[in-house]
Amino acid sequence: MAAKSKKPLPSVDQLTKAQAKVEHKRLALEIAMHDERYYQKDAPTVSDAAYDSLRQRLNAVEARFPELVTTDSPSQKVGAQPSRAFAKIRHAVPMLSLGNAFSDEEVAEFVARVRRFLNLGADEPLAVVAEPKIDGLSLSLRYENGELVNAATRGDGFEGEDVTANVRTIKDVPHKLKGKNIPAVCEVRGEVYMLREDFLTLNKKQADSGDTIFANPRNSAAGSLRQKNVAITASRPLKFFAYAWGEMSAMPATTQFEMVKWFEKAGFAVNPRMILCRDVEALLRYYREIETERAQLSYDIDGVVYKVDRLDWQTRLGFVSRSPRWAIAHKFAAEQATTVLEKIDIQVGRTGALTPVARLAAVTVGGVVVQNATLHNEDEIARKDIREGDTVVIQRAGDVIPQVVSVVTDKRPKHAKPYSFPHVCPVCGSHAVREEGEAVRRCTGALICPAQAVERLKHFVSRLAFDIEGLGDKQIHEFYDAKLIMHPVDIFTLAKRDAHATDKLKDREGYGDVSVRNLFAAIDARRRIELNRLIFALGIRHVGEGNAKLLARHYGTIENFRAAMAEAAAAQTEEGNPSEAYADLNAIGGVGDIVADAVVEFFAEERNVKALNELLHEIEVLPAEQVRADSAVAGKTVVFTGSLTKFTREEAKAQAERLGAKVSGSVSKKTDYVVAGEEAGSKLTKARELGVAVLTEDEWLKLIEG
């Protein structure tokens, strides 16, 4: 079940159409994941350079296979969906991102493209504004009659988050515009950022108070702006540079340079390093100057932006997909340094992923002391042939996560041996397996691995699992730290152990007689649990709510399920000759190889089985309810939408599934029924557009009750 090492990615020119389709899907999913982490969670996990390389490969695939381009492709999108934590604001003019240039040649080609598009003669001048590219959070400010009325983040480019109240606390953002010639509607756009000095001071305060430490100034600025508590934003030293605009009822200027100067007169801070250039050579000289002075600047930048100066030419040039033709970002090369890799450590994440980390002889990269760097995964170690004791090149790009770029092989010590990636978890000793098609090796000790314990316990008591009232994330952390709940079974022995303990739970801060009695009662109320909930609670990789129900319905009882998995796990080592139990598992509709392998891997780890057996001594597992094949909705696809009054959404879903229906979260041509409650929205609209049958709650009940 473990996969072989992956080969380096083939050149795009070598891809067949079928391979390109698979590669395009992989790149789109990976880019979407990184967009969400960057734009929504303010917690990027790859460097700017690594992200840019994904974008470049996607663009190359789409250039060779243009039929793969869809409206959902990352090349057609900007940013990520706005967070649900904030109200949304629709941008009157989309907030698009910029195309990137990574070399002098690409900058020269940008200028040549502009000249060709505008049909400029060889001697006709082309003025271009150049300015540092601030590494912060894009923001749009809307003024009506000179007064600030709202502020929104970029979001997905078309719809952003309403952060008006928070933005009003930023000193660089005027509440009322100054001067004359102010348009009735004026949208000013720019970047929220934080000075490096302020970032370091903030992180020290965060550390002293035990709060979250930010990775870099960009993350701290984004996280500070996107606070639900306005007082927190007000306490953070946020700044704002204005450099662009959205909807304008009248234009105060005719050039980019004059517009930015008008922003300054209106009361905004603007970047004093903005200049006007007349040719490619001047652009590149400016780029070198800013690159040289980068470390001395008080704020982070990740490149230089070039914009055609004349606004009428900007209008003629227009846009292509997700970016304007009249502007481009000239990105800096990643900052690098050379040092010795002293040791490779393996860290185990909360999902069981084994991640290699390089421990380095301390080296300064871009003004920051680096002692650790990511090695990504075992394939990267093998591909670069990274060994302990090697002299390596370290790169920091975008101030995110340092990484090992390459090995200086002529400095390799004679005793250095190829690194052997562990096949067991360094924390708990369980098997570490790598699934087909994945780069990550994972610990299979789901129930017993300390590195995964807290997240597994939180999952175990979650709403779709044991759903124990009063035992949430906070309590799980507290009880784990106090060594009161280390494994699932400890939840159900907590009351018994507390009765004989010297330090009673009721004497702990935040607890008392009543709260402890209520907690123990809530735990006892969950000693009887449905089979599908138990299977879901085990936290087996790839086994979500839906697959847990499929497994429960197929095996019926916990005894049948355990016996079948024991047989399948026992025969696991017989390559090419799966047991009858494994074949039966794999044949369940909706399960397949990936889920089947994950379930068998779980039961192949003896300590998981031992932990489950201990748990079963404390609980009663109810047999699965059998699906009715003769009901009126058996085999039908149903969508519930709006506010239901006769039952909860979960009750409606469970009832429909017991009757053999498939419950979906979205409406499509394959949907048979949409059950619409009060205030039904877009799903109801789409159902009517597609001609899908729409039922009220009463009509639904009449249908299923015959």
Curated annotation (Swiss-Prot):
One of its GO terms (molecular function) is DNA ligase (NAD+) activity. One of its GO terms (biological process) is DNA replication. It catalyses: NAD(+) + (deoxyribonucleotide)n-3'-hydroxyl + 5'-phospho-(deoxyribonucleotide)m = (deoxyribonucleotide)n+m + AMP + beta-nicotinamide D-nucleotide. InterPro entries: BRCT_dom, BRCT_dom_sf, DisA/LigA_HHH, DNA_ligase, DNA_ligase_AS, DNAligase_adenylation, DNAligase_N, NA-bd_OB-fold. Residues 628-706 form the BRCT domain. It comes from the Bacteria. Zn(2+) binds at C425, C428, C443, C449. The active site is at K133 (n6-amp-lysine intermediate). It is an enzyme of class 6 (ligase). NAD(+) binds at D48, A49, A50, Y51, D52, S97, L98, E131, R154, E191, K307, K331. Keywords: DNA damage, DNA repair, DNA replication, Ligase, Magnesium, Manganese, Metal-binding, NAD, Zinc. GO terms for cellular component: cytosol. The keyword Metal-binding applies. Its EC number is 6.5.1.2. Gene3D superfamilies: 5' to 3' exonuclease, C-terminal subdomain (1.10.150.20), 6.20.10.30, BRCT domain (3.40.50.10190), DNA ligase/mRNA capping enzyme (3.30.470.30), Helix hairpin bin (1.10.287.610), Nucleic acid-binding proteins (2.40.50.140). Its cofactor is Mg(2+); Mn(2+). PROSITE patterns: BRCT (PS50172), DNA_LIGASE_N1 (PS01055). Belongs to the NAD-dependent DNA ligase family. LigA subfamily. DNA ligase that catalyzes the formation of phosphodiester linkages between 5'-phosphoryl and 3'-hydroxyl groups in double-stranded DNA using NAD as a coenzyme and as the energy source for the reaction. It is essential for DNA replication and repair of damaged DNA. This is DNA ligase. The gene is ligA.
